[in-house]
């Protein structure tokens, strides 16, 4: 987990309380939920889920900026998903999702997704990289390069590959104008994992939220009981004094304030 150009990572934004004034970090949204501010908690949870989704986009995990300008360009993967996937076309994903991912804390979700995406998929500008040693191309045919999915050990299409007839150099690229099979190959693996992670994060949110809420309510109850006891003790003390004694007590406090 490293940020673009060594800036803050998505995990930092999602887990580090106090990074920004409008705090929707994990500790803060658990606190919101515990204190009954559910609207803020659920808005914050949406932010966390969005950040976790980013960990299943190769550019986000391979230090590959893609802001759509002439220098960085777009993310081919995000562009293809945005143009080709919607509620109707996602039906097949539903049946291939599997059970939620279960980790002990929110950081583990970010680490797992980022490591898997980084190690198994290329981004457009990191195919020939001196920084990343993975993914590893294990085979070629006339049109494609193949990698091995670390989760299930399956061989899958990972890049387009074409040998230049003049130079003999193997040209590798991630997408073409007319053939998007690599994007589809990536999506079929990354999207179910994103959904499984989100389901696990939601489950973790309610588990931690319940623990935090029970603790908060117990603390509030103890505070109320302590305050009630203090008020009752004061009332009992005052009821035992006559009016003249109360006057003298008040006069004493007033005198002390001015001496």
Report each predicted region and the residues it spans:
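N-terminal, motif-rich segments that launch catalysis or mediate targeting to/interaction with membranes
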Residues: 1-47, 51-54, 58-248
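Low-complexity, charge- and small-residue-enriched intrinsically disordered regions
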Residues: 123, 249-259
